[in-house]
Amino acid sequence: MVSGTGARLLSGAVIVTCAALLGPSAPNGAHTAKPLPAGAPEEVVPNRVMTWNICNPCNGSGQNVGRAAEIATYAPQVVGLQEACVRDVERIRDHLQYQYGLVYHVEYGSVLRDWGRCGGLPWSPGGFGQAVLSAAPMTDRASVEYPDGGSEDRGYMAVTTLVDGRPVRVFNTHLAHRHQEAVRAEQVGVLAKEVARHDRSIVLGDFNAVPDAPELTGMWGLATDVDPECGPSATGICETTTDWHTKFDYIFLRGFDRLEHGVRPSHYSDHSLLHADVGPKQPGRLSHPGSRVVFRPDVKELRADTPPRHPNGSLIFAANGMPGNRT
């Protein structure tokens, strides 16, 4: 029989042990909402998408409360998170719902289980990888590990949801570390093959590569990033998305046009939030960065007067908006 004092000591020891087992993703603060900037939306904004590498390990006090506030500032319809622990995403989603009234469905694409990163129990560590939050329901979830992840397991996930009121395939990926170019090239090949199957797709993620990196050629051949100044042939100033002043994060659009976009640095990650408002693809609009569209009233064509240095060449659109011959 255990005395009252002994029972209390035993109970305290159990609590301490459980707290240690739960690991770094255990609750780290009360559910106190952080105030949002003036003008922040009160409801989910239709057709707004976001990608964010939330940084792990970045487990200071109040991280998930702060992450939720960053997302709520823009209230996107679809959010792709990388370096995401399942437990952290659950808390972020709870904060979004109960503190800001933003309700999201969630799907996961965990590529490994890691107690050191994501807590849990030694025999059941937390999942780590990608996650997608969507205001609309999601179906047909796929989670794929790349054959070669590089120095750490990497992969992509995909879901079908609604954007602009129509089904769209949303991908979320995190490619190999920055000094593993050959590995990333193979990973892009795997991802691009699947993206090419869908006329309407949005690819979110941390590609760990700058826009003119050779390994991204496969993506530029299929889609365009939401930043018109970022691309293999763009000549403008490409806005960076990391604390080390590089562009690693992308929202690739296929079958959509970018309406506007923004980059928001964050205290809660070494990556910035990249968000964009998108709309259906308009016939005749040239989408490749680094090109201009010239309207010629004397001819029945539209063409790029400065063809981008792009694997599939410059595009010519006839007056009826249908693609013409490639030059």
Label for each model-derived stretch:
Residues G120-V168, N172, D257-E260:
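A well-ordered secondary-structure block
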Residues P46, M50-V65, W115-C118, P122, ...:
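Acidic/histidine-rich helix-loop elements
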